[in-house]
Structure formats: structure tokens, C-alpha cells
A protein has these predicted regions:
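Membrane-interface extramembranous regions
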Residues: 1-149
């Protein structure tokens, strides 16, 4: 829920600041700024909630902590890439692929009742997918519209 709030609030703030400062609004840029802010937030989670994030990674994959930190770093790099005219398109394409690839980890987290912030097995369970899957589709669509369309 926090990433969604950050996405919408930063989008609205970006629009307001553009309108006040420039008397015009670049909605695509505002959308990329909002997506970048959201990615900074989610990247922070990779460093703050390491144990819970490790629990999301399938058991057959070794070096779970490496994956957690690496994806956090990738999210930070993507946040930067979204802000430059020369890189936002490739960043958007790679982000869409990333969002598709991480969905199984979110599904596994729900199936195992993983509470990411606590690193425990008392999370909301499968009912969370009714929110998470549409949210992931929103992130993919948002990324497409502000970077590739």
C-alpha cells in the first residue's frame, strides 16, 4: 500500500510544482518522477527488511541475501534511469520485465503468509493477492505509459 500512496502523492505533487513553476504540465515526466520515488521507497525496503525479503525468494535459489540487495540496487538505478531523457525508455522496458519477474515472489510470499516487514509467517496470506496482483498490473501499466507510449 505504501508504494501506491507514494506513487500517487508524488505524481500529484509533481503536477502541482510543474504548474506553479512553469505554467505547464508534463504528465509523462511527472509520472516518471513518481515512479522513481516509489522505487526509492521499495529499494529502501530491500535494505531494511532483508530477512522478510529473503523469505520471498524460492528455496531452490542460493545466495538469497545477494538477490535481495541486488534487486534493491537495481531499483535505485532504475529510479535514476527514469529521470534522464536518454535512458528512461530502456529503463521502462527493463522495469516492466522486472515487475513481471518479481510477481511470483509476491505470490509465494502470500502463499506462505510471509510478513516482509517482520520476517515472520503471520502475513495476510492469499487474500493479499486480490490487492497485489492488480497493483503489479498497475505498476506495469504505469511504467509502460510514462516510458514507452
Amino acid at each position: 500500500m505504501k508504494p501506491l500512496i507514494v506513487l500517487f502523492v508524488v505524481f500529484a505533487l509533481s503536477i502541482g510544482i510543474m504548474w506553479l513553476a512553469f505554467s505547464s504540465i508534463n504528465y509523462m515526466l511527472a509520472g516518471r518522477i513518481a515512479l522513481a520515488a516509489m522505487l526509492v521507497l521499495t529499494a529502501f525496503g530491500h535494505f531494511k527488511f532483508v530477512e522478510g525479503m529473503e523469505m520471498m525468494i524460492p528455496d531452490f535459489l542460493p545466495f538469497k541475501r545477494f538477490f535481495v540487495y541486488s534487486t534493491g540496487i537495481l531499483e535505485l538505478l532504475a529510479a535514476v534511469g527514469l529521470l534522464f531523457d536518454s535512458t528512461f525508455e530502456i529503463t521502462g522496458l527493463l522495469l516492466i520485465i522486472f515487475f513481471v519477474l518479481i510477481l511470483p515472489s509476491n505470490i509465494q510470499a502470500s502463499m506462505r503468509h510471509i510478513n516482509i516487514e517482520k520476517g515472520t509467517l503471520d502475513g495476510p496470506g492469499l487474500s493479499y493477492l486480490w490487492f497485489r496482483v492488480p497493483l503489479q498490473i498497475l505498476f506495469i501499466g504505469w511504467t509502460y505509459f510514462v516510458t514507452l507510449r
